[in-house]
Amino acid sequence: MKRTASIGTLAAMLLAASLAQAADPLDAITAAARSDQSFSGFSAERGAALWGRKGKDWSCSTCHTADPRKPGRHTVTGKTIQPMAPVSNPKRFTDAAKVDKWFKRNCRDVFNRECTAREKGDVITWLRSVTPSSVIP
């Protein structure tokens, strides 16, 4: 009986963990953005503009390139960065913890502050809208 309960508990925990990972990271960002009464949705256009906007020293495109379908290179470490656009890298934006971690780190590096929920949602919306035939200015 104990063994059956343990297996059932383990199965429930694994299901909960897989559902948590399957949740779209944009869902949590959307919930946070909705706390602002002026929020009316995310904008790919604003996301593209933020991607190219220079912060204190860099822009997102400094390391990630202007074309998010291509791999980038970290300016300081020289490490290769996989493409940001899901069309080139389907694993992008599939893990909410990673999305949160990297937005915190990169927004601080680029803008010397954390990005707002709207800014994060705008960037993800733009990156998800990029197709193989998209024209990137």
State where each predicted segment sits:
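C-terminal capping alpha-helices of c-type cytochrome domains
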Residues: 100-137
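Electrostatic cytochrome c docking/interface patches
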Residues: 23-55, 111
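Cleavable N-terminal signal peptides
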Residues: 9-10, 20
